A protein has these predicted regions:
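A short, basic N-terminal segment
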Residues: 1-40, 45, 355, 375
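C-terminal leucine-rich, beta-strand-based interaction scaffolds used for sensing/assembly
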Residues: 2, 6-7, 292, 296-375
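Short, locally clustered residues in the helix-turn-helix/winged-helix DNA-binding domain
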Residues: 34-35, 163, 255, 269, ...
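P-loop NTPase nucleotide-binding core
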Residues: 38-39, 44-48, 52-156
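Conserved Walker B catalytic segment
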Residues: 127-196, 204
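Helix-loop-helix "sensor" segment of P-loop NTPases
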Residues: 201-252, 274-276
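C-terminal helical "lid" of AAA+/P-loop NTPase domains
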Residues: 247-253, 259-273, 311-314, 346
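Conserved C-terminal helix/linker of AAA+ ATPases
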Residues: 271-293
Length: 375
């Protein structure tokens, strides 16, 4: 039987520590916080590797064997109902591999949803709950936290894109969650978020429920030399190597952001280049190929925008990281009106085309940014 060779540059999910680059100190610190029963607010830009770090922590032997590890991403949730849905589904997903006794105990706690849980032909539970089935989210949330408190092992719950709860229409969600978490002594939480300003307000403002509730961790880009060594260790399996100059170009082209570097390395690993030593032009051609593949998807994405919104998006992409969109220099350079910018920037922020962080505006998608720069 022909064995399919695994591409070692993982771009979705988490496989094992072997395919996870560095973060040794961060993994140790996060593990130490959680085993010392501290909640953690993990704050870093999107695609820098927060979820990978969490999964890597959960794979540590002293964590994996002694805790129930639960991970949910609430980026797409819009209200408390959807949050409860995601949390319940995430817990069941984590418990299913651990045997009937473990997951059955959880399901028996969910009296408000018991009639909506279904089972496959092998008798394994399926999260067939619909958002509309959660008639009383506060009651279901109480049942979920009752399970966390009474589970046979302590639980670690990671909630990714946690700042999303601040935008729910129910204005007391932060207080609701804080109260339940405070009274739950058998679980600890990782609150992971990419919008640094919002996360900082949630965890450092005295007026917010989560004030001083968690240890705060940040993430920086992985060290360039460490990443180069990791890349060449895995490229060697395919009889390839990337030059230091080529990797420096790749690393700085994407500001050291893990996901984009992994994506390009993933493509380089299987490139048809005859060279054993990959150079800067190999990296350039690979990036061009990626942008070409994405072209139609980006055209459809931009079709959602008005002409003025698109004009502002292109201007931000061309400028790189403008600190002000209302300066006369910026407006004149890109032929924009102040009133146009004021209206368009809110739409672009709300739809996650751009982000405003640490005093600068930039596109959320680096590939889209490069595509717009190229015209």
């Amino acid at each position: 039987m022909l064995m399919v060779q695994l591409n070692p540059f993982i771009i979705e999910g988490y496989l094992s520590p072997e395919y996870f680059c560095d973060r040794v100190e961060e993994t140790a610190l996060l593990t130490r916080h959680l085993t010392n029963r501290c909640n953690v607010a993990l704050i870093a830009p999107r695609r820098l590797g927060k979820s990978g770090l969490i999964y890597n922590c959960f794979q540590q032997e002293n964590i994996r064997e002694q805790y129930h590890c639960i991970y949910i991403d609430i980026y797409d949730t819009k209200n408390l109902n959807e949050f409860v849905y995601a949390l319940g589904k995430g817990i069941l997903t984590a418990l299913k591999p651990k045997g009937r006794k473990v997951w059955e105990f959880f399901l028996n706690m969910l009296q408000s949803l018991k009639s909506t849980i279904s089972f496959d032909i092998n008798g394994n539970p399926e999260w067939s709950v619909g958002w509309g089935d959660i008639q009383a989210p506060d009651i279901t949330l109480d049942e979920i936290f009752a399970y966390l408190e009474q589970a046979d092992k302590p639980c670690l719950v990671a909630i990714d894109e946690f700042q999303t709860v601040a935008n729910y229409p129910e204005k007391t969600v932060e207080a609701t969650l804080r109260k339940r978490i405070q009274n739950c002594h058998n679980a600890n939480f990782v609150f992971s978020g990419s919008k640094r300003h919002m996360m900082a307000l949630m965890f450092t403002s005295q007026s917010r429920p989560f004030y001083h509730s968690s240890s705060i961790m940040g993430l920086e880009a992985i060290n360039e030399q460490t990443y180069l060594d990791f890349a060449n260790h895995h490229l060697a399996r395919n009889n390839k190597e990337i030059s230091a100059a080529a990797f420096t170009y790749l690393y700085h082209h994407f500001d050291g952001i893990t996901w984009y570097i992994q994506y390009v390395l993933n493509m380089l690993y299987t490139s048809i280049s005859d060279r054993s030593l990959l150079q800067e032009d190999d990296v350039r051609m690979t990036i061009d190929s990626i942008l070409s593949q994405q072209r139609f998807a980006y055209q459809a994405l931009l079709y959602q925008l008005t002409a003025k919104q698109k004009q502002l998006l292109i201007a931000i992409a061309q400028e790189g990281k403008p600190s002000s969109l209302m300066s006369q220099e910026f407006l004149q350079k890109y032929h924009l009106g102040a009133s146009t910018v004021q209206g368009a920037v809110k739409i672009l922020l709300d739809r996650d085309f751009i982000t405003q962080d640490e005093g600068v505006y930039q596109l959320c998608d680096k590939f889209l940014e490069l595509s717009l720069r190229a015209g």
